[in-house]
């Protein structure tokens, strides 16, 4: 079972009950989170034996960029990730997920800072998620507004992949290529 959302930590009582019930039924759980929520609850959930995977979204290491595009500081997120990664058993479950949006969070300094953070916290796996515009027409159809973003160049995404592999010594995959 994958528990996602919005943000799964926005419903901590429900998510905790669900993971506990899944444990009683010997059902494996994957947590899909941005890490924005109560760190103690996140660590409790992450340490449960039936939680086998944690997909952790890192939208931007730069707090100003993160705040501009999400409306929130990333300090709580980074602290929660530090706490999770300080436990080797939990750390082994973490798969970082990094959306790449051209001109927003894919600048070389941001990539280097992100790789350093991952390395400092001994994180081993990252999925790069190049932005694509699929879904824009649906959002426009239902009356939503979407800021125009650009898809990163495939060659540049490969360069980022190699950098994470070589400098941060991570296993890297590129997902969602269109």
What are these regions (language model features)?
Residues 2-5, 9-129, 134:
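Conserved AdoMet/S-adenosylmethionine-binding subsite of the radical SAM
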Residues 100-178:
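Auxiliary Fe-S-binding modules of radical SAM enzymes
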